[in-house]
């Protein structure tokens, strides 16, 4: 199961008591700000979570897997995410969801 923007908005509605419309707008604004920062070449640092960074990949040789023909892979910018130490540690020590939900009644 994936966590979606709708799930986050629903959680904000439930936990903070703000309207569903405000919760959805808050989530949209949050992600829009991240997108705009990355588009303008800025790094995005979220304390306790991680960093979103832009990386420039140079042109490199590639190969068409169907024909075997050599083709150049063009240079491009990509977004990378580097998790922070707190996030790494919490994920490393977390129980997988299927284990947490397993109550042994099988």
Swiss-Prot record:
Q: Kindly list the GO molecular function terms attached to this UniProt entry.
A: DNA binding; structural constituent of chromatin
Q: Which UniProt keywords apply?
A: DNA recombination, DNA-binding, Transcription, Transcription regulation, Translation regulation
Q: Where is this region: Disordered?
A: 85-106
Cross-referenced SMART domains, in alphabetical order? BHL (SM00411)
Biological process terms in GO annotation: DNA recombination; positive regulation of metabolic process; regulation of DNA-templated transcription; regulation of translation
Pfam families tied to this protein: Bac_DNA_binding
Assembly with partners or alone: Heterodimer of an alpha and a beta chain.
Among PANTHER family, the record links this protein to:
DNA-BINDING PROTEIN HU, INTEGRATION HOST FACTOR SUBUNIT ALPHA
Q: What is this protein called?
A: Integration host factor subunit alpha
Q: Which gene encodes it?
A: ihfA
